[in-house]
From Swiss-Prot:
It comes from the Bacteria. The lineage of its organism: Bacteria, Pseudomonadati, Pseudomonadota, Gammaproteobacteria, Alteromonadales. The gene is ruvA. This is Holliday junction branch migration complex subunit RuvA. The keyword Magnesium does not apply. It comes from Shewanella loihica (strain ATCC BAA-1088 / PV-4). InterPro entries: DNA_helicase_Holl-junc_RuvA_I, Hlx-hairpin-Hlx_DNA-bd_motif, NA-bd_OB-fold, RuvA, RuvA_2-like, RuvA_C, RuvA_C_sf. Keywords: Cytoplasm, DNA damage, DNA recombination, DNA repair, DNA-binding. The keyword DNA-binding applies. Residues 65-143 are annotated as: Domain II.
């Protein structure tokens, strides 16, 4: 199993990255909360990974912290939640925000995420409550460990910011009409693609 990668960040297009180590390039899918914590291209990156083997593919999912990876692993053990939906959940909200949703039985926020209907949200609240309690105890009850503090610095603005943002939202499972509407509603002149993606996601929660 591949549990950790340290290498050169060669490609970076939300929600996927390519990290080269030992002459091998690893394609990794990441939740946007972790994606925003990555360094600039051609710099060294260190991520914790979860390796999934399917009949038709072998996939790597990456995270900046062990805590977020631990939450991802708990999510995919929930009935009806696979890696893709777990990634979408952790892209739409931070790990800390998800913990608060479970603590407060906040179905209304969860159902705003693509792929999460009322039944799935209810199942998440029920099944994750005890699992999160164990996870928090393992972290000494410190919820701050689940909240990523971003040191993100906007990249130079490019003309394709809106296109990049829409593509990222589509990759997360949003419908074309939803993605276009969300991006258009928050777009301001001078926004780079990553800032636009974050603002678009926030507008839909």
């Amino acid at each position: 199993m591949i549990g950790r990668l340290r290498g050169l960040l060669v490609e970076k297009q939300a929600p996927e990255v390519l990290i080269e180590t030992g002459g091998v390039g690893y394609e990794v899918q990441m939740p946007l909360t972790s994606f925003y914590e990555l360094p600039e291209l051609n710099q060294e990156a260190v991520i914790y990974t979860h390796f999934v083997v399917r009949e038709d593919a072998q996939l790597l999912y990456g995270f900046i912290t062990k805590q977020e990876r631990a939450l991802f692993r708990l999510l995919i053990k929930t009935n009806g939640v696979g890696p893709k939906l777990a990634l979408t959940i952790l892209s739409g909200m931070t790990a800390g925000e998800f913990v608060k949703c479970v603590e407060h039985d906040d179905i209304a926020t969860l159902v705003k995420l693509p792929g999460v209907g009322k039944k799935t949200a209810e199942r998440l609240l029920v099944e994750m409550r005890d699992k999160l309690k164990s996870l928090m105890e393992a972290s000494h009850g410190n919820e701050r460990e689940f909240v990523l503090q971003s040191n993100y610095t906007p990249a130079p603005v490019v003309n394709t910011a809106e296109e990049d943002a829409i593509s990222a939202l589509l990759a997360l499972g949003y419908k074309p009409a939803q993605a276009s509407k969300a991006v258009s509603s928050v777009f301001e002149e001078g926004m780079d693609s990553e800032t636009l993606i974050k603002a678009s996601l926030k507008s839909m929660l």
